[in-house]
From Swiss-Prot:
Major subcellular location class: nucleus
Naturally occurring in which organism (per UniProt): Xenopus tropicalis (Western clawed frog)
Task of the protein: Acts as a component of the essential kinetochore-associated NDC80 complex, which is required for chromosome segregation and spindle checkpoint activity. Required for kinetochore integrity and the organization of stable microtubule binding sites in the outer plate of the kinetochore. The NDC80 complex synergistically enhances the affinity of the SKA1 complex for microtubules and may allow the NDC80 complex to track depolymerizing microtubules. May play a role in chromosome congression and may be essential for the end-on attachment of the kinetochores to spindle microtubules.
Coiled coil: 249-394, 467-636
GO CC terms of this entry: kinetochore; Ndc80 complex; nucleus
Lineage: Eukaryota, Metazoa, Chordata, Craniata, Vertebrata
Protein known as: Kinetochore protein NDC80 homolog
Claim: Coiled coil is one of the keywords in the record: yes
Highest taxon of the lineage: Eukaryota
Signal peptide: none
GO biological process annotation, one example: metaphase chromosome alignment
Subunit structure and binding partners: Component of the NDC80 complex, which is composed of ndc80, cdca1, spbc24 and spbc25. The NDC80 complex interacts with mis12 and zwint. Interacts with cep57r.
């Protein structure tokens, strides 16, 4: 609802009485807007009375032209400075502009932004004199009363804001320097404008018809002519310009080659876009929690990203471990190659000795026989060695897989323990027990048995406590569900009551609107009757002078009767309006009280439900119990 400007109550209709004292840039219209219940009556205006106040000053209603072209624009009212002088960023920007201008134009001293944070009065006078010499080259600082001279110069240049004398004594003060530096920046803008005006470029050359200016706006001489003609008529006392508007529309259509056949296509496109907007709004209404669901999806994806990052970290650590193993195997391989080379050299040496010796045939046969036996023995041993190596490699693979599986299970156990707040010992549900397993898998297997015996007893104790908590939470949940069901039933009943009250309020609103329309029709009818009577009076004055007195008496009588009827109608409408307003206010207050009560109930139920959901650990405890049982089975299984 909108609040009326006449009374402090909430109006049921849009605001009809506008602020008559606020000046606007639009052309004033001839009709006076009046509030509801006030029948418009034409009041006779004297030839010298003031009718309206325009943006440019007072305008007489007798049709005579104004003596002044522009009027009292703004008067002597003090203009409020719209610049953010209390904003540090704005002041620093002004200081930078001042520093850049002085340094670029050859100021006698090299200035920095820091040195201009709070200059002295002497430095300010030098800076002002340097800038002002661009406008007045013969200017010199006054020897005395500079506090009066400088504000006077700014005023003569047209600076719209006043500079006090006291500010000239404390130029560098924190409360004064922002106003001074803003004035200096304005003076710099004046200097730049003067430099542009002194140049030979035709800056203010009038653009041609249809030409585009620098800021992208099309210049239109037709609109300028239309504005001049309308303003001339406005200053002569006219308030409507229908003939100029029609002529302007025709000229614009001819100038821009408007094809009226395309209007229907544009209207269809507009309707299509409106339907698209309605469809999107319906989709938005059908999916009110889409943002919440997307946020939940975002949180879930972030959790998945964190899991993948943890997995990558584990993979990197495992890769580092494999690299260490590869390096150790490479070292063993190099050592074995060195031994093989030494054995080959020894064989070559022995073979050389064998070739140089002289043996008998029996010795050669015996040596060949022994050589064959040794070769068979070597082949058998080599085969056994290969089998042992293959078996050792398979055992190492099994051990590595088993170790990796155990490490994965340990990391998963630690992750679940942190998730359910059992790790570290200071966690919420740890009860001082240390459930973290820190064992060396390369050592004896008795450490796993030790940790299994260490963890089983506290876990059994925590499981027994959890079962009791689950039973209590289940009972509490059932009670809360019953309460929520009762509250939902109550809310449904209250919603039905609110719907009935809203229907009644809608009917009253329709009745009220009907009464308003009837009153407006009566008002229009009375206005037409008054206009016809006025025309009849004018005809009687021009045609028949003898019956003037009788016509005036009849007119006065008719006006009295009309005023009486208007007064009676106004009183009746006021009474009807008051009754309707009281009824609608009562209904609105009742609806507001019911909505407030329902909102309080809803908030209370939501708070209780949120508190219950925070305490609802049934699902988490069941998952925890299943995981504990699974881990217990793993720990109870015999180690490899």
């Amino acid at each position: 609802m909108r609040r009326s400007s006449v009374t402090n109550r909430q109006s049921l209709l849009p605001l009809r009485v506008q602020d008559a004292n606020r000046m606007g840039l639009t052309t004033p219209q001839s009709k006076d807007r009046q509030g509801f219940g006030k029948l418009s009556m034409s009041k006779p205006h004297s030839g010298t009375s003031e009718r309206k106040t325009s943006f440019f000053g007072k305008r007489m209603s007798n049709g005579t032209a104004r003596t002044s072209q522009y009027g009292a624009f703004g008067g002597t009212e003090k203009i409020k400075d719209p610049r953010p002088l209390h904003d540090k960023a704005f002041i620093q920007q002004c200081i930078r502009q001042l520093c850049e201008f002085l340094n670029e134009n050859g100021y006698s001293q090299t200035l920095t932004v820091k040195s201009l944070q709070g200059p002295s009065t002497k430095d300010f006078l030098k800076i002002f004199a340097f800038i002002y010499t661009f406008i007045c080259p013969n200017y010199e600082n006054p020897e005395s009363k500079f506090e009066e001279e400088i504000p006077r110069i700014f005023k003569e240049l047209g600076y719209p804001f006043a500079l006090s004398k006291s500010s000239m004594y404390t130029v560098g003060a924190p409360h004064t320097w922002p106003q001074i530096v803003a004035a200096l920046v304005w003076l710099i803008d004046c200097v730049k404008l003067c430099c542009v005006l002194r140049s030979e470029n035709p800056v203010f050359e009038e653009p041609q018809m249809g030409e585009q200016s620098e800021n992208g706006i099309d210049f239109n001489q037709l609109f300028l002519d239309y504005t001049v003609r309308c303003y001339d008529q406005f200053m002569e006392g006219r308030d409507t310009f229908e003939e100029y508007d029609a002529d302007m529309c025709i000229r614009l259509k001819e100038a821009y080659h408007v094809d009226e056949s395309n209007l229907e296509a544009l209207q269809q496109e507009s309707r299509r876009l409106l339907e698209e907007i309605e469809r999107l709004e319906k989709e938005k209404e059908n999916e009110p929690d889409r943002l919440a669901s997307m946020r939940k999806l975002k949180v879930s994806l972030q959790a998945d990203i964190q899991k993948y990052q943890n997995y990558l970290t584990e993979i990197e650590s495992h890769s580092t471990l494999l690299e260490q193993r590869v390096s150790s195997v490479s070292e063993d391989l190099e050592a074995t190659e060195l031994e093989s080379r030494a054995v080959q050299q020894e064989n070559l040496r022995l073979k050389n000795i064998l070739d140089n010796q002289k043996y008998s045939v029996a010795d050669i046969e015996r040596i060949k026989y022994e050589e064959n036996e040794l070769q068979q023995t070597i082949a058998k041993l080599t085969k056994d060695l290969d089998e042992d190596k293959q078996q050792l490699w398979s055992e190492e693979l099994k051990y590595a897989k088993m170790k990796e599986s155990v490490e994965t299970q340990l990391s998963e156990f630690h992750k679940i323990g942190r998730k359910v707040r059992l790790i570290p010992p200071t966690a919420e549900y740890a009860n001082g027990y240390d459930f973290q397993i820190q064992c060396n898998l390369d050592s004896e297997q008795s450490s796993l048995i030790h940790y299994r015996n260490k963890i089983n007893v506290p876990l059994v104790e925590i499981l027994s406590q959890s079962e009791g908590q689950i039973a209590g939470a289940t009972n509490k949940k059932m009670g809360v569900e019953d309460m929520v069901e009762q509250l939902n039933t109550l809310i449904g009943e209250k919603k039905n009551e609110v719907k009935v009250q809203k229907d009644e309020a809608q009917k009253l609103e329709e009745t009220y609107q009907q009464k308003v329309e009837e009153a407006e029709e009566d008002e229009k009818r009375w206005i037409s009757e008054i206009e016809s009577l006025e025309k009849h009076r004018q005809l009687l004055e021009s045609g028949v002078n003898k019956s003037l007195d009788e016509a005036l008496k009849d007119l006065q009588k008719e006006q009295q009767e009309l005023q009486l009827v208007e007064h009676q109608t106004e009183e009746e409408m006021r009474q009807v309006e008051n009754k309707l307003v009281r009824v609608v206010h009562a209904v609105a207050n009742h609806v507001a009280v019911i909505e407030k009560h329902l909102e309080e109930k809803r908030l209370k139920v939501e708070r209780e439900y949120e508190e219950f959901m925070k305490e609802d650990l049934l699902l988490d405890l069941r998952e925890l119990l299943d995981k504990y049982k699974e881990k217990a089975r793993v720990l109870d299984s015999p180690p490899y």
